[in-house]
């Protein structure tokens, strides 16, 4: 039986490129090599496409994907050279230029099926401010927030924020993930510094009311028909779940399924599915919620390319539902092909 080519794109231009490499290495080990041939391409911080390894069988545990230190610049290619008829692309890319619609649009121009959400839903979900406004419009609860856009009057923004929110306040770049650039402010001075830090990552800044809450996550899978998982919980040993805690210090554990009332489970799964459809989602996403002590549910964000390592929440949520990691990858390939066929059928 001939194998289908699965193209892995990893690395990328955003500050989340290290997470991308971890996710891609997990995928390359989990793929069913009876069915797939895996070709990998590293995208440098400057946006260069480098042809890296090819796998026809499961690599050894010591095998690592090539990155900045090990790539061969002689293998630099034109981005369009990744094209291969019949191949499916898994853009295991996080953050700007990865899950913001940019690479998705490129792959649509190439006429290649790809795993994940489309251009529109990727770009909307990547921007935390736009996501909040869309979800508010359909009645999904959001924590109170204000917005600062680079070039506006910062002092006026501080006055407005302190009139509407109380400390602690969280400040986030609108277009970053993996908690990159997020700060917790307890004073006006810290708030100003937090906004200035966020501006180094994005020109749009979300300023959000801090809440004492559990962090609960729901996985989503599907195209026109979407399925959701039972929720899982992020158990924190730190003040908040930042990049260092997530990927460097390993100061988090997960409870899957989360220990929450059935009514809350039903509410979260419903909100997650409605949000996914409202943003035009397809393929996969992970919805992140806050659950307060009094039972209030807030949808914090919708992540269209969640961390995909074997220890990441998203694959583990589906494993808890009976869908093993290799089978999850196969299902995503099938969904990618379905969406490709649907897009092509509309081009008449």
UniProtKB/Swiss-Prot annotation:
**What cofactors are annotated for this protein?**
Mg(2+); Mn(2+)
- Record-annotated residues binding Mg(2+) 1? 288, 301
Q: Please tell me where ATP binds in this chain.
A: 162-217
What is the main EC category here?
Answer: ligase
Q: Where in the cell is it found?
A: Cytoplasm
Keywords from the UniProt entry:
ATP-binding, Cell shape, Cell wall biogenesis/degradation, Cytoplasm, Ligase, Magnesium, Manganese, Metal-binding, Nucleotide-binding, Peptidoglycan synthesis
Q: Where is the ATP-grasp domain?
A: 132-334
What EC identifiers does the entry list? Answer: 6.3.2.4
Catalytic activities: 2 D-alanine + ATP = D-alanyl-D-alanine + ADP + phosphate + H(+)
Q: In which pathway does it act?
A: Cell wall biogenesis; peptidoglycan biosynthesis
| Residue positions binding Mg(2+) 2 | 301, 303
Where would you say this protein principally sits, based on its record? cytoplasm
Q: Which SUPFAM superfamilies does the UniProt entry name for this protein?
A: Glutathione synthetase ATP-binding domain-like, PreATP-grasp domain
The Gene Ontology CC terms held by the record are: cytosol
The UniProt GO MF terms for this protein read: ATP binding; D-alanine-D-alanine ligase activity; metal ion binding
A family per Pfam: Dala_Dala_lig_N
Gene Ontology biological process? cell wall organization; peptidoglycan biosynthetic process; regulation of cell shape
The reply on keyword Transcription regulation is no
Q: What note does UniProt attach to the cofactor annotation?
A: Binds 2 magnesium or manganese ions per subunit.
- Which top-level group of life is the source organism from? Bacteria
- Give the protein's biological function: Cell wall formation.
Similarity annotation: Belongs to the D-alanine--D-alanine ligase family.
Name used for this protein in its record? D-alanine--D-alanine ligase
Organism, by scientific name, is Streptococcus pyogenes serotype M5 (strain Manfredo)
